[in-house]
Regions:
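Membrane-inserting effector segments that mediate pore formation, membrane fusion
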Residues: 83, 88-115
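Terminal, membrane-proximal amphipathic helices
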Residues: 1-83, 120-173
Length: 173
């Protein structure tokens, strides 16, 4: 039996989650970037063999993409954007969640909300990374590796410029 429950988060609710994220960022300042990535990967590994609700599973794919984006040596995300992404991943360093993970059906609700909020904030970066990965995959066809660094660099620069334009536009609105 499937039960669908839908809810909206008010501005007040979002401020509450923003406050929690700020606390996590403050605590994560003591953590090296590698620790933040490692903690996020540990969460992903733990959940890989866990029966989580579909809404959580969908968000975990976004979380995996965030980690990949930050660690992808070919994408070479600039330092400012890496910092922004790591700030978003900071919530996953803390072992104590807003909602304890062991509660069936709901335990990962706070994680899913945080992932969604971080993904919303990182939309320009995630879009650029998604397009970069698609481009790289398409060019991996047999015989397409000649000049690989050049065509990856060219596409990367285009996408990072687009990302910056979108970020500026988003900040103005």
């Amino acid at each position: 039996m499937l039960m669908r429950i839908s809810f909206d988060l008010s501005d007040n609710d979002l401020r509450h989650f923003d406050l929690i994220m700020k606390e996590a960022r403050k605590a994560a300042k003591k953590s090296a970037p590698e620790q933040i990535i490692s903690a996020t990967r540990e969460l992903l590994a733990k959940l890989e063999n866990t029966d989580v609700p579909a809404f959580v599973e969908q968000r975990l794919e976004l979380l995996q993409m965030m980690v990949a984006m930050v660690t992808d040596d070919e994408f070479k995300l600039p330092a400012a954007e890496v910092k922004r992404a790591l700030n978003g991943l900071a919530y996953f360093v803390e072992p104590d969640d807003l909602i304890p993970d062991h509660i069936p059906g709901l335990g990962f609700l706070d994680d899913a909300i945080m992932i969604e909020l971080v993904a919303r904030d990182l939309r320009p970066e995630l879009d650029a990374y998604r397009d970069f990965c698609q481009f790289r995959e398409e060019r991996r066809a047999p015989g397409e590796n000649e000049g690989r660094e050049g065509w990856l660099d060219s596409r990367r620069r285009q996408l990072l410029e687009r990302m910056r334009r979108r970020r500026k536009k988003k900040q103005r609105s």
